[in-house]
A protein has these predicted regions:
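Catalytic Walker B motif of ABC-type/P-loop ATPase nucleotide-binding domains
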Residues: 159-162
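Helix-to-loop junction immediately C-terminal to a conserved catalytic motif
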Residues: 53
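Walker A (P-loop) phosphate-binding loop of ABC-type ATPase nucleotide-binding domains
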Residues: 40-44
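ABC transporter nucleotide-binding domain
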Residues: 176-262
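Conserved ABC ATPase "signature" region
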Residues: 101, 105, 112-130
């Protein structure tokens, strides 16, 4: 099993007035499985992912795959990657099939192989019936699913997903998590988000990022162990929720099935 290794990785942005460390001295290794990169907006998640896929060059440190620096691997490494950025470009008047064929051509995939993969991927992401519809008619959830499909066209060994559930409704979010969970069995999947529920049930490892550094890493059980017995879930009125939110550290609020109440 090949390993993706980040060693002493840093990214510094400089201008005439100041410098900002977007990523600070990260060392971590990835093998097959789903890795949840959790952190608020601006924590450095996107910068880290752009370095992993080779869009950004680290200021310091290195990234290796199977012991070889990715800069030396060049196109060989890029062929191992599948990438879904937070905002990915597409031609609005293309149908789903035409768009995926276009991406397959860019990735130099043989047309016969591409046809079979596209059919399989559309089924995997639940878009078979929408295959001939134009992308401009797709909902946000459908676009994220076609984004997953394009990232998987080259059967990547490393799948990078940057805020893949952004803007999705709860039902689409669940569907997306189910898709991602199945993908980590034979590849490295790195998923970034600022929403805890996106990773708590599907990630083999969770990495919490703040100000460019990892402040906590481990399994879900390991992450939650220090707060065992200190977290409660309850159903309260909206007024009580406001009072509790002002007094305690509330991690999540959502509407309850009971009218006028929240969980």
């Amino acid at each position: 099993m090949c390993r993706l290794m980040l060693t002493g990785l840093e990214k510094v942005y400089r201008d005439k007035k100041q410098e900002k460390k977007a990523v600070q001295n990260l060392t971590v290794s990835f093998e097959h499985g789903v890795y949840g990169l959790l952190g608020e907006n601006g924590a450095g998640k996107t910068t880290l992912m752009r370095m992993i896929v080779g869009i950004l060059k680290p200021t310091q440190g290195q990234i290796t795959y199977d012991g070889i620096p990715i800069r030396q691997l060049g196109g060989t490494y890029r062929n191992l990657l599948g990438y879904l950025p937070q905002d990915f470009g597409y031609y609005k008047d293309f149908s789903a099939v035409r768009f995926l064929n276009y991406i397959a051509a860019l990735k130099a995939i043989d047309s016969k192989i591409a046809k079979e993969r596209i059919d399989n991927l559309l089924e995997t992401v639940g878009l078979t019936e929408a295959r001939n519809k134009k992308l401009k008619t797709f909902s946000g959830g459908m676009l994220r699913r076609i984004g997953i499909a394009q990232a998987l066209l080259n059967e990547p060994k490393i799948l990078i997903l940057d805020e893949p559930t952004a803007g999705l409704d709860p039902r689409e979010r669940v569907r997306f998590r189910n898709i991602i969970s199945a993908l980590g069995k034979n590849r490295i999947v790195i998923l970034s988000t600022h929403i805890v529920s996106d990773v708590e049930y599907i990630a083999d490892q969770i990495m919490i990022m703040k100000q460019g550094a990892f402040i906590k890493t481990g399994t879900q059980a390991q992450i939650l162990e220090p707060v065992a017995g200190c977290v409660w879930k309850c159903v309260v009125s909206e007024k009580e929720a406001e009072e509790l939110n002002a007094t305690y550290a509330v991690s999540n609020l959502r509407g309850s099935e009971r009218e006028g109440q929240v969980e």
